């Protein structure tokens, strides 16, 4: 399914004609340049590879430089891939822009969530705290029991515990497109999207719409 790679600019709000305030996230979508077209015959699946934005020449590795030169496109800040369906055809060097979403009402947005570092079970998994008083001296924010007894004699895999939180791939589904601004290459999406300001986000038509 074809989507677009953009950059999260931040949040603002827009007003409807009735005066209702709608919170929106602004996503800047510079032209997505197609750097490679993958086919069933050569790669085993059909997809397009895109890049967007710009990258300093001294930051482009030799393999990357060769790849972009072969495609005849300017080096971008990364490479992303979208699977093709229903025999869609694209050419290397072609550009995709926000007008792709002119007829689409709902989208799924994928980004990298904000990193929170090492966090306890209360913040990380929304556990309840234990008593602050009533004889409890040291276990106010402890998770509590983590298992049973000699049987099974171990802690099950996947047990929710303290650990690294955030900085992982997150998708928020069924977000509404409020406005497509083709002149300024902006998408205004209702509500919040994953990640920090300036982070890369992938916007695709909603799969559950």
Curated annotation (Swiss-Prot):
One of its GO terms (cellular component) is cytosolic large ribosomal subunit. It holds the Pfam family Ribosomal_L3. Methylated by PrmB. The keyword Isomerase does not apply. The modification N5-methylglutamine is found at residue 150. InterPro entries: Ribosomal_uL3, Ribosomal_uL3_bac/org-type, Ribosomal_uL3_CS, Transl_B-barrel_sf. One of its GO terms (biological process) is translation. The keyword Transferase does not apply. NCBIfam families: L3_bact. One of the primary rRNA binding proteins, it binds directly near the 3'-end of the 23S rRNA, where it nucleates assembly of the 50S subunit. Part of the 50S ribosomal subunit. Forms a cluster with proteins L14 and L19. This is Large ribosomal subunit protein uL3. It comes from Vibrio atlanticus (strain LGP32).
């Amino acid at each position: 399914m074809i989507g677009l790679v953009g950059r999260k600019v931040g949040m603002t709000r827009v007003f409807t004609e009735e005066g209702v305030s709608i919170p929106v996230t602004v996503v800047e979508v510079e032209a997505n340049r197609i750097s490679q077209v993958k086919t069933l015959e050569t790669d085993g699946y059909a997809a397009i590879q895109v890049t967007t934005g710009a990258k300093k020449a001294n930051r482009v590795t030799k393999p990357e430089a060769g790849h972009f030169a072969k495609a005849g496109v300017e080096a971008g800040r990364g490479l992303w891939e979208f699977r093709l369906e229903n025999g869609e055809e694209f050419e290397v060097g072609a550009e995709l822009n926000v007008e792709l979403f002119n007829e689409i009402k709902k989208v799924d947005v994928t980004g990298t969530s904000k990193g929170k570092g090492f966090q306890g079970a209360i913040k990380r998994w929304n556990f309840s705290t234990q008593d602050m008083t009533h004889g409890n001296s040291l276990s106010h924010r402890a998770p509590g029991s983590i298992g049973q007894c000699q049987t099974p004699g171990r802690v099950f895999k996947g047990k929710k515990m303290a650990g690294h939180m955030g900085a992982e791939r997150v998708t928020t589904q069924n977000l509404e497109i409020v406005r497509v601004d083709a002149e300024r290459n902006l998408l205004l999406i209702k509500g919040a999207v994953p990640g920090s300001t300036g982070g890369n986000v992938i916007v695709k038509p909603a799969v559950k719409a």
